[in-house]
Amino acid sequence: MTKFVVIDDINSKENTEKYEKYQKVVFGSTFMNYAMAHWTRKSYTNVKVSLMASGVNPLTVAAMDSGFMFTYAGGSFITGQLGDRFSPVAVVAGGLFGSTICLLLIVFGASTSIIHNAAFCGSWFLTCQLVHGAFQATGGPVNTAIMGNWFSSKGRGLIFGLWTCHQYVGDIAAAIFSGWILHSGYDWRWCITVPALINGIWGFINLWTVPNTPEEAGIITEKSKATVVSPSGEKSEVAEAQPIGFIQAFMLPNVMSYALAFGFFKLVNYAMFFQLPLILTSHFDASTSNVISSLYSVGMMPGGIVCGWVSDLYHGRRACVIATFMGILCPLLLLFAWYMDTIPVIVLLILLAFMGCLVGGPNNIITSAVAADLADDPSIQGNNKALGTVTGIINGSGSVTAAFGQLAIPILFEWGKADGVGYRYVWYFLIACTIAGTSLMSGRIYKELYPNEENDRQPLSAQGAGHYRGYQAVPTQEEKA
C-alpha cells in the first residue's frame, strides 16, 4: 500500500530562522501590494469631482464606478484561477503594472483633447476604468494565496486579521496624499499620477524579491522532502500538486455557503459605507455627516484583528465567532431603525465605531483566514494550488451580490419616505441580510460545535489549538509516522 513519509528533519535552527525571515518579507510585501491597490483606487475616487469639472460627463463617471465594480467582481473569479495556475507573485505584479497603465491613461485622457471630444471621451474613460477593475481584482485572491503558502493554520486568524488592515492603510494614504496635493495648489492629476508610478515601481520590486513558496526560497519543508514509498520499498518524489478547477473549488465543503454568506455581509458593509453619509445628512450638515460616518471605517480596522484573534482562541471556530459578531450587530441595526433620530451624538459615534468592528471583522476574516482554511480541505489532500481559486470565488460572489443588492436601497428608501419612516426599511433590509448570511453558515456552525468522526475531525476537547485547523484535523507527529 502506498504511503507518505517525511525523510528529513525540517526543524533545524537554520531552516526555522530562514523561514521566519521570509515570512516577514512575504507578510510585508503582500500587505504593501494590497495597500498600493487601495491607494491608487482611492486616489481616483478622491478626484472624481475634479475630473467632472475638467469636462467628463457625470453620467460617464457614474458608469465608470459601476463598471469598475462589475469587472472587479468578474475579475476575482479569473485572477484566483490564474494565481493557482501560474506564479502568483507574477500575477500580482501584472495587476500592479496594469493598474498603473490604466490610471496613466486616465490622466492622459484628462490632459489632452480627448476630454473635449464628446464622441470619444466617454468611451475612453469608461474603457480605462473597466480594464482597471479587472487588474485590481488580482489583489485579494492572489495575495491571499501567497500568504496561505507561507502561514499555516496555527494562529492564522490573528495573522490574517492584522494583514487585512492593508486596505485601510491604503485608503488613509490616499486621503492624506490627495488632501496635501489639492491643499498645496498642485494640479489634481498628480493625485493619480504619483501613486500610479509608485504602484508600478513596487510591482517590479515585488516581482524580484518575493518567493511564491518556501521551496522557492530553498527552505526545507515536509512537502519538499516527502516521498512515496511503494509496497516493494521503492521511493519516488511526490507529484507536484495540480491546480483545481473552478467547479471543483466551488464544490469544496462550505465554499458555496461562505460565498453566498459573504455576499450578504458585504452588502451590509457597502450599504453602511456608502449610505451612512447620506442618511446622516438628514440630521447633520454634510461636513459633520462625513466626519461621523468615518467612525464606522475606523471601527473596521480592528474588526478583522479581533475576529481573527478570538477565532484562534476558540481553536479555529471561525463560523461561530462570525455568527456571534452578526448576532450582536442585529439589535444595533434595529436600534438605528427606531431611534436614530434621537440618539445623542456621543453615543452615535461609539455605536458606529462598534458596528464597524462587527461588520469589518467577519468581512475581513472570510476573505483571508476562512478562505485559507477552506482551501486546506482534506478532499484535495493539502493541494496548495486551490487557495487563489477559493478566495476568488468568495470575493467575486460577494462583490456581485453586494452590487445588485445596492439597487434595492433607493427603492426601500422611497417606500419608507412615502410611509413617513425615512430609512427604517433600509435598516430592516440590512437586518434581513445579516440573518440570511448567518443562516447560510448554520451547517458549518453546527459542525464546529459538535465535531465528529464523519467530519474527519476529532473532538476539540481532545486537541489543542495547534492541532485544530478550523476545517480539518491536523495529524500529530505520531500519526504522521
Q: Where do the protein language model's features map onto the residues?
A:
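Extracytoplasmic
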Residues: 25-56, 272-277, 366-367
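Glycine-rich segments within core transmembrane alpha-helices of 12-TM secondary carriers
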Residues: 157-176, 182-183, 299-300, 391-405
